[in-house]
């Protein structure tokens, strides 16, 4: 059972923390409100796949939250050497015996929460730091991910 979902920087979600009801959850909302994106993020964290392909094959600039990219570009063009945008999806799981292999305290909860869970992080490859720095000098709204 998932006890908490945290999504940072993925598509529509700049920062989302959701604690599902242990019995029943209905996801409703207007078109383009993030219902499918929420389910996609959960599946991505659980399997590392999206649309039947690995995350690395499917990664594209539209995965990154546009507000975070805009803020990053604004800060960089102002001369502030801010960190590159990242995507982080965390699934906190019920503390049960069969899930203890997934137990750890490497999550963003403060104070530290030692519990079973799964996380996925998408961040720039340091091997391409020169290319990314060059892009940042004249940045476009889409983060290069090729």
Segments from the language model and where they lie:
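Glycine-rich phosphate-binding loops of NTPases
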Residues: 60-86, 92-146
């Amino acid at each position: 059972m998932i006890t908490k979902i945290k999504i940072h920087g993925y598509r529509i979600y700049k920062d989302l923390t959701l604690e599902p009801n242990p019995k029943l959850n209905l996801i409703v909302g207007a078109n383009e409100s993030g219902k499918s994106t929420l389910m996609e993020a959960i599946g991505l964290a659980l399997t590392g796949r999206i649309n039947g392909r690995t995350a690395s094959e499917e990664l594209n600039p539209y995965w990154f939250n546009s507000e975070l990219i805009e803020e990053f570009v604004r800060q960089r063009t102002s001369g502030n050497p801010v960190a590159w945008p990242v995507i982080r999806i965390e699934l906190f799981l019920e503390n049960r015996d069969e899930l203890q292999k997934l137990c750890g305290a490497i999550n963003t909860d403060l104070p530290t929460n030692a519990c079973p869970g799964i996380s996925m992080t998408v961040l720039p490859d340091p091997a391409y730091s020169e290319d990314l720095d060059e892009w940042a000098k004249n940045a476009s709204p889409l983060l290069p991910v090729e």
